[in-house]
Amino acid sequence: MFGLQNRSGSCWVNAALQAIFRFPDVQERYSSNTFEAGNVIDECLMKMWNSKGTVGLHEFHEAVRTDTMPAGLNVGDSHELLNYLCDKLPFLDELCRFKIAHSMECVHCKAKTTTRDSVIEFTLDSVDGRNVPITTCITKTVQPYNIDEWECEKCKKRGGIRQQLIGSFPEYMMFHLPLPNTTVDYSSILILNGKKYGLLSVVCYNGAHWWTYGRNMPPGSSWFVLDDTHVVEHGPKQFPVSAAMRVLIYYRLDE
């Protein structure tokens, strides 16, 4: 584990990078000096990994900087940067992307339509309360719910049931938690449709500062707080739970 320099409020950049540097596939890729020719972001990440953060960070800021992501100039959003990196790094997108479906069924004539899409994260619905299990948040997000004002194109009557479903399960499952009124009780091991996932990294935000909790695989390895240049090791069972968790990334474990 290594730290990253904070340049003019770039904690959000560091938090996102530390999250993906925990991916075993990312570690293997960059340890073998592999990167896509002509992809500056990919090359910068490879340099950062192999130099333990001493080379490549400034060039990375220059490569990803936009009006909404002021890397190296001001505070931005780690969650937004993670999405951006998946867009710019095809190998990362492939590791994280999965299928979802949205269905709408008329409560009167039972006509049903389904739209399908692919995404790189699953945004969880808000569940008010403290210490809400992440499994409860997932269940609520995929439960069907009524939309009384929806009008059926077939029978022209109002009232429908909408539902979101997960259609495939990627190597890395990223959950986004826009839950200001919820303290999520994470699970270190998560079973999704028979697939076993281990918690790998967690991106946190307290309203002013971003940082990451992370560990290497296999499960049972020590957790680390990765906060800019500050790297603090905790035991494997001493994950420092925080109400500031915003992105949880799970790694699919092969049986």
Question: PLM features: residue spans?
Answer:
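Intrinsically disordered, low-complexity segments enriched in polar/charged residues with Gly/Pro
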Residues: N83, F91-D93, L199-V202
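Exposed substrate/partner-binding surface patches
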Residues: I20, N33-F35, A111-K112, R116-E255
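USP/UBP deubiquitinase core
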Residues: M1-L89, S103, I249-Y250
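Short helix-to-loop capping/linker segments positioned immediately adjacent to catalytic or ligand/cofactor-binding
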Residues: G72, F91-C96, G160-Q163
